[in-house]
Amino acid sequence: MAKDIFPRRPIQRPHASIEVDSSGIGGSASNSEKILCLIGKAEGGEPNTVYQVRNYAQAKSVFRSGELLDAIELAWGSNPQYTAGKILAMRVEDAKASQLEKGGLRVTSKIFGSVSNDIQVALEKNTITDSLRLRVVFQKDNYQEVFDNLGNIFSINYKGEGEKATFSVEKDKETQEAKRLVLKVDEKEVKAYELNGGAYSFTNEIITDINELPDFEAKLSPFGDKNLESRKLDEATDVDIKGKAVYVKAVFGDIENQTQYNQYVKFEQLPEQASEPSDVEVHAETESATVTATSKPKAIEPFELTKLSGGTNGEPPTSWSAKLEKFKNEGGYYIVPLTDRQSVHSEVATFVKNRSDAGEPMRAIVGGGTSETKEKLFGRQAILNNPRVALVANSGKFVMGNGRILQAPAYMVASAVAGLVSGLDIGESITFKPLFVNSLDKVYESEELDELNENGIITIEFVRNRMTTMFRIVDDVTTFPDKNDPVKSEMALGEANDFLVSELKILLEEQYIGTRTINTSASQIKDFVQSYLGRKKRDNEIQDFPPEDVQVIIEGNEARISLTIFPIRALKKISVSLVYRQQTLQA
């Protein structure tokens, strides 16, 4: 008797669990989104970050190139009739971003990998407006952008009869942020603006107020968005504004603001050398002392066009376990590791089993290398032997969107198969579904296909008849080839079971867990379950169910439900009995 409990991991807190007995059937059902997860090598993307991509252009902008991007293209294009929906993808290498420290700035690439070393940055003097001009160049993307008139935020002009007028920006010694803007006429304070929050947190608010003062005029710089947080203003002392408009400056604040949405670089202001701290304070207490040392930021100076450096792609780690954990609770269902390493396949098998046992059903599709022998494939299957893992045997060539021919090892073909199965309705089998392969490295004979299929290995066969030639998937077997338990040996039926029991579990928990038994009767729960199964039957997700077999018993604080379901099966065999007879013609 084959039984499976969902979730398998014992739970002591209030919950619902479902026991599935699949001994009465020999294996399928219908429609919902099955999110595909891919992990592999790429030229772009932040390490340890899972990206959700919905189209190829978006994927290319993130991952740039590499096996991961090719796998995404295969998942969406190996059979246009059935393509994956959104894809969750992550690069596996611990890549590093390039950097540049120059002119008082630290420039860090937002692109991770060696390609980021080709980004160039320059900070130049604009002598016409007494400001700075920033250039960012990345020739590989034909990108060049200029940020001009940086540093000038708003001007202040005093037009009154006083002999002297000045403004000052005072900084907090501890935070190194602007704290007060002070206007003076003839050494007398006219007004002081508190800049660390409150009514004058942004420069627009200061300008509005200054223009209400007699004989003062303030104007925002007309170049770009200059409405900065006022705490980012640069320090200034007694700047003469008698009869002339002089700019209040915020060089780094303006650079940071203008480039905040730049997709290539980000900026930090460097501190003065740590060996020469200023404003050292010691606060002694009875049993301890606190030492505070503040370094002023470096002055920002112009510098010539310079390349960033230090970006590296890194290598895939020996173990992918920590990387796989990033896909927890992301909502993925199928996951494909883009590697032929058996140790990683075992880690993926453990990962999907653990997630499924915890109540988040997942499945994996893995593949080997190029032109692997049957014996090696049998060895891979024997090590895996997992009802939640499928193994793809074939490697081959695909024509990609840009016209190039991709030599795809079996683990890349696995991404194409995963894209196909993700695009099918829940419980629909990939058996005999065509795959748009240009050629296979090894075309198996009929006996070999039978042998591989019986051992739980997915294969692709070449079909030629009078009307068409194509490549199609032989069967939807898992690496657990027990024909007596099709829920475990067939991908489609196992998938249908996952979605059916996980949805029923959630609905029962939402509807009944925590309710008082005086308000809940066995007949109510029975009606609820029958209604749910009736809906699934109408949606073609189950074949049928006997309503009289739905039984509910409530004893104490526990409800026990038993039911029988006839699943929708994928037709696997057709037998035709054909008899020829001789016709006698006479006249």
Curated annotation (Swiss-Prot):
Cellular component GO terms, alphabetical: host cell cytoplasm; virus tail, sheath
Subcellular location: Virion; Host cytoplasm
Keywords: Host cytoplasm, Viral contractile tail ejection system, Viral genome ejection through host cell envelope, Viral penetration into host cytoplasm, Viral tail protein, Viral tail sheath protein, Virion, Virus entry into host cell
Pfam families xrefs: Phage_sheath_1
Keyword Amino-acid biosynthesis: no
Entry-linked InterPro entries: Phage_sheath_subtilisin
Chief site of localization: virion
DNA repair among keywords: no
Organism superkingdom: Viruses
GO biological process: symbiont genome ejection through host cell envelope, contractile tail mechanism
Transmembrane segments: none
Function: Polymerizes as an extended structure around the baseplate-tail tube complex. During ejection, the sheath shifts to a contracted form, thereby making the inner tail tube protrude through the host cell envelope.
Family (UniProt): Belongs to the myoviridae tail sheath protein family.
Subunit organization: Homomultimer.
Name of the protein this chain belongs to: Tail sheath protein
Species per Swiss-Prot/TrEMBL record: Staphylococcus phage Twort (strain DSM 17442 / HER 48)
Lineage: Viruses, Duplodnaviria, Heunggongvirae, Uroviricota, Caudoviricetes
